[in-house]
Amino acid sequence: MRRIILAEDDDSMRGFLERALERAGYYVVSFANGEEAYERIKQEPFTLLLTDIVMPRMDGIELARKASEIDPELKIMFITGFAAVILNCDVAAAKEAHVLSKPFHLKDLVREVERLLAA
């Protein structure tokens, strides 16, 4: 089973994303900030890191950088309203990540996750 770790500080958004991905057959573990997600990544492997960029305690770009140091094969997708931040980022993991700009429909999220994991 494909394992997704989700980091999103908005409780409602995190719940919507988690339910949509679980309904699509994915195992999802979610956290409200990058720091907690990073601690979990250190404990067990995941197939995909799905993360917001702007979060408390550790932003999504830093989370992606640290997570890719632990697992260079980890696929990364940013969900954000701040796509320009990614375009100007000098972190290699962020440059190779897929970006899904908010707002988006949940079916678009599932389709993009499927496409990324199939690559």
Residue ranges and their predicted role:
Residues 62, 82-101, 107-114:
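Alpha4 helix (beta4-alpha4-beta5 surface) of REC/receiver domains from two-component response regulators
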Residues 15-23:
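Charged docking surfaces used in two-component/phosphorelay signaling
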